[in-house]
UniProtKB/Swiss-Prot annotation:
This is Phosphoribosylformylglycinamidine cyclo-ligase. It is found in: Cytoplasm. Pathway: Purine metabolism; IMP biosynthesis via de novo pathway; 5-amino-1-(5-phospho-D-ribosyl)imidazole from N(2)-formyl-N(1)-(5-phospho-D-ribosyl)glycinamide: step 2/2. The keyword Ligase applies. It catalyses: 2-formamido-N(1)-(5-O-phospho-beta-D-ribosyl)acetamidine + ATP = 5-amino-1-(5-phospho-beta-D-ribosyl)imidazole + ADP + phosphate + H(+). Keywords: ATP-binding, Cytoplasm, Ligase, Nucleotide-binding, Purine biosynthesis. The gene is purM. Its main location: cytoplasm. Belongs to the AIR synthase family. Disulfide bonds: none annotated. GO terms for biological process: 'de novo' IMP biosynthetic process; adenine biosynthetic process. GO terms for cellular component: cytosol. InterPro entries: PurM-like_C_dom (IPR010918), PurM-like_C_sf (IPR036676), PurM-like_N (IPR016188), PurM-like_N_sf (IPR036921), PurM_cligase (IPR004733).
Length: 347
């Protein structure tokens, strides 16, 4: 049987074309430590010249979740790759690690070279923002597993940190100040609820602007996750950071305690930062209690860092000089978990 594999739904030539198209984007991410090029059986990275006394590799993996369904609906695929990178590199930078390289995994029902190129273009942009190299990946065409228009996307990153500079939160104590770095929006968590509340129950259109949103709903929901690597690494050069939390699934309530030692809790001052209109819209349309919102979404803060009180204002200034919106949002206290003070300030 001629072209048996193609008749089974796998187009090898389309896969080759996709690889050819993505090469120019991958090349823009290359660090000098990368050995070899795209197309080998494995990616190689030379650690020998990195100036660390006791180098420790730190790895992370994550996906984009059901935010992908918004990309399918909007037929927009050039930013979802930024999300994949962000979810991985933000997780390892909170331990003090500099991301070195990234690998992607794309599984699809039908290999569409143009669509795959757009996905990888976003991944490459995320890698440039994080300062890491895209050294490999896998594109798997799986007819019957996914529909022709569907794909899944996951990523994997490896970073490095000097052993004595690993941030674990073990030295956190009461009286440290918590600084929040603004998110770009929803980031990549909570989209199953977002779709149910706004699109299914609320019957909202992705093309319309609602309430106090400044963009059409689809553009707002597809804003890429903010990558905090460069400002955080700059911060670590100048100030001691005692703990960091990437605010992802589980929001404030689940993620902040991950950086706190036993016997220490966090007190958050509501109103110390502005919460973006998209969160207000979700809360109002879905009639969701405030506490639950903080247990699902980042609520406008994508990263929390703990520093000494005497350094707090200087740290905020440094982060602002790096282009971030940063706020003093609370403090560590004796106890456990996360407590909230005051009322919420919505933009």
């Amino acid at each position: 049987m001629a072209n048996a594999y193609k008749q089974a739904g796998v187009d090898i030539e389309a896969g080759y074309e996709a690889v050819s198209r993505m090469k120019k984007h991958v090349q823009t991410t290359m660090r000098k430590e990368v050995l070899g090029g795209l197309g080998g059986f494995g990616g190689m990275f030379d650690l020998s010249k990195l100036p660390l006394e006791e180098p420790v590799l730190v790895s992370g993996t994550d996906g984009v979740g059901t935010k992908l369904m918004l990309a399918f609906m909007a037929d927009k695929h050039d930013t979802i790759g930024i999300d994949a990178v962000a979810m991985c590199v933000n997780d390892i930078v909170v331990q003090g690690a500099e991301p070195l390289f990234f690998l992607d995994y794309i599984a699809c029902g039908k290999a569409d070279p143009s669509k795959i190129e757009h996905i990888v273009k976003g991944i490459a942009e995320g890698c440039r923002q994080a300062g890491c190299s895209l050294i490999g990946g896998e594109t798997a065409e799986m007819p019957g597993m996914y529909s022709k228009e569907e794909y899944d996307l996951a990523g994997f990153t490896v970073g490095i940190v000097d052993k004595k500079k690993i941030i674990t939160g073990h030295s956190l104590d009461e009286g440290h100040v918590l600084i929040g770095l603004a998110s770009s929006g929803i980031h990549s968590n909570g989209y199953s609820l977002v779709r149910k509340v706004l699109l299914e129950d609320g019957q909202m259109s992705l093309d319309r602007i609602y309430g106090r949103l400044e963009l059409p709903l689809g553009e707002e929901l597809l804003k890429p996750t903010k990558i905090y690597v460069k400002p955080i690494l700059e911060l670590l050069k100048k100030y001691e950071v005692y703990g960091m939390a990437h605010i992802t699934g589980g929001g404030f309530i689940e993620n902040i305690p991950r950086m706190l030692p036993k016997g220490i809790g966090a007190e958050i001052d509501l109103g110390s930062w502005n919460i973006q209109p998209i969160f207000s819209l979700i809360q109002e349309v879905g009639k969701i209690e405030e506490k639950e919102m903080f247990n699902i979404f980042n609520m406008g803060i994508g990263m929390v860092v703990a520093v000494k009180e005497e350094n707090a204002k200087a740290v905020v200034r440094l982060l602002e000089e790096q282009g971030e919106k940063a706020y003093i949002i609370g403090r560590t206290v004796k106890g456990s978990g996360v407590a909230f003070n005051g009322g919420i300030d919505h933009e």
